[in-house]
Structures are given as structure tokens and as C-alpha cells.
């Protein structure tokens, strides 16, 4: 028997996860945790003296110098532990109605991995070229709109980095836009680095 989960990096979650791990191991259940939300673990990027970074630019330079793992293909498990029947989300009456204040959300965000993939594809095809000049203009829809997908684990920063790099390899005139966009992924990494080391 084993339980697997993706690591979290804020202090309260680390404490909770360690407690859960101890409880499971006390009843002989193996626990394996993984990094699914960052390019590098917060403890993997350090200054030459071995201390955590406090400034973005040297942090991102050091992070980019790290070797990256190749994203693995999605593999469906051969079997999944069966659970007892439970209520559906529809049973909980969470879908808004009268008024349906969420009616337009589907125009802006398609939840799930498929929606994340489509959003990344559309961003690369239609918006990456102007990203450097347009990203700071709130009146334009010039950002990647991947934040929610990243937050909920529907796409990984490694997949974004890999897909953007592969796309720009075929369109080298976009290399400056690529650097500007990937630096935003870097800022996300840096925020986790700071959260972990300096909560």
C-alpha cells in the first residue's frame, strides 16, 4: 500500500503533510511525494555560498542554468482503487442559477488539462509575438491566462517551458518574447523560493 501526493511549500502545508506522512507510515503505508508545480525544488537553487536567493535576477539566472527533466508522457494507470459510490457535484447544487453569475466564465476559462493545453496553444499562436510590448496593458488580452491552470495543477511550468522553447525553436524571431514570457514563470518560481525560505 502506498499514498502519493504532490509537495506543497508553504509552512502550514509542510507541517500538515509531515503529520499525515507520519500517521500513514505508523500504519505501514508507504508515502511518496513529488514536485509537480515547480521547475526546481526551492532548496535546489542557492547562491555560491549555499544560501537562498533574495533577488530575482541572480535567482533566475541560476535556475535557468539547472538541467531540466524531460516531461513524461501521460500514462493512464492500469487500475485505480475503487471507492464507494458518492454524491455528484450536481447533488451539491453548486451550479449558480437565478441569476447564473458564472454564465460567461466558459468564454474566458476552460478548466482542466485540455483547457490548459488549448490556452497555451492559443497563446503561442496568437499572443506570444506581441507579449513583450502588450503584457502590461490591462485593456488588452495579452497575457497567457495560464495562472489558474498552473495553480490547480492542470499544466506544469515544465510543460510550458518545454512547449514555448519548442515553438520558438521553429520561429527564432520570437526569442525575445520567449525570454520575457519565461521570466514570468521565473517570478512564479522565485515566489515559491521566497515562501519556502523566508515565510
Model-derived features with residue positions:
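Trp/Phe/Arg-rich N-terminal binding region typifying the photolyase-homology
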Residues: 1-71
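Glycine/tryptophan-enriched, flexible segments
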Residues: 51-198
Amino acid at each position: 500500500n502506498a499514498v502519493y501526493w504532490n509537495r506543497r511549500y508553504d509552512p502550514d502545508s509542510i507541517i500538515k503533510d509531515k503529520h499525515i506522512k507520519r500517521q500513514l507510515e505508523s500504519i505501514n503505508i508507504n508515502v511518496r511525494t513529488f514536485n509537480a508545480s515547480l521547475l526546481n525544488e526551492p532548496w535546489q537553487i542557492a547562491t555560491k555560498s549555499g544560501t537562498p536567493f533574495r533577488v530575482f535576477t541572480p535567482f533566475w539566472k541560476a535556475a535557468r542554468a539547472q538541467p531540466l527533466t524531460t516531461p513524461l508522457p501521460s500514462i493512464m494507470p492500469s487500475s485505480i482503487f475503487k471507492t464507494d459510490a458518492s454524491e455528484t457535484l450536481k447533488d451539491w447544487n453548486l451550479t449558480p442559477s437565478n441569476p447564473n453569475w458564472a454564465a460567461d466564465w466558459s468564454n474566458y476559462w476552460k478548466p482542466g488539462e485540455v483547457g490548459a493545453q488549448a490556452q497555451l496553444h492559443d497563446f503561442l499562436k496568437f499572443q506570444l509575438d506581441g507579449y513583450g510590448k502588450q503584457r502590461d496593458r490591462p485593456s488588452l488580452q495579452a497575457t497567457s491566462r495560464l495562472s489558474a491552470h498552473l495553480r490547480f495543477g492542470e499544466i506544469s511550468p515544465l510543460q510550458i517551458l518545454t512547449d514555448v522553447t519548442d515553438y520558438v525553436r521553429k520561429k527564432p524571431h520570437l526569442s525575445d518574447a520567449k525570454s520575457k514570457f519565461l521570466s514570468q514563470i521565473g517570478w512564479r518560481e522565485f515566489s515559491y523560493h521566497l515562501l519556502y525560505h523566508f515565510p
